């Protein structure tokens, strides 16, 4: 099973900006590793939440399209809300 997500570059940083994203059904994330600079991105919460229900999400290489460029990544870390079934933040490492 392959996973492909559309993302946009995140310009606003910080707690307030992240809270606004989460309130609007989005989740902040970061892509790092390899020879490129880290990129802060925004993903659709529901699409990622549905995909993470599959075991393959954690083991396979995922494709994230950021500004028209495809990034091959693996999930490095996921932060979840302690009481709600919500994702708070994701870390991806370039494959």
From Swiss-Prot:
One family name in Pfam for this protein: Ribosomal_L25p
UniProt keyword annotations, A-Z: Ribonucleoprotein, Ribosomal protein, RNA-binding, rRNA-binding
Entry keyword RNA-binding: yes
GO cellular component, one term: cytosolic large ribosomal subunit
GO molecular function, one term: structural constituent of ribosome
TM region(s), chain numbering: none
Single biological process term from Gene Ontology: translation
Classification via InterPro entries: Rbsml_bL25/Gln-tRNA_synth_N (IPR020056), Ribosomal_bL25/Gln-tRNA_synth (IPR011035), Ribosomal_bL25_short (IPR020055), Ribosomal_L25_dom (IPR029751), Ribosomal_uL5_bac-type (IPR020930)
Annotated HAMAP family: Ribosomal_bL25
Function field: This is one of the proteins that binds to the 5S RNA in the ribosome where it forms part of the central protuberance.
Family, similarity comment: Belongs to the bacterial ribosomal protein bL25 family.
Quaternary context: Part of the 50S ribosomal subunit; part of the 5S rRNA/L5/L18/L25 subcomplex. Contacts the 5S rRNA. Binds to the 5S rRNA independently of L5 and L18.
Protein's name in the database: Large ribosomal subunit protein bL25
Biological source species: Actinobacillus pleuropneumoniae serotype 3 (strain JL03)
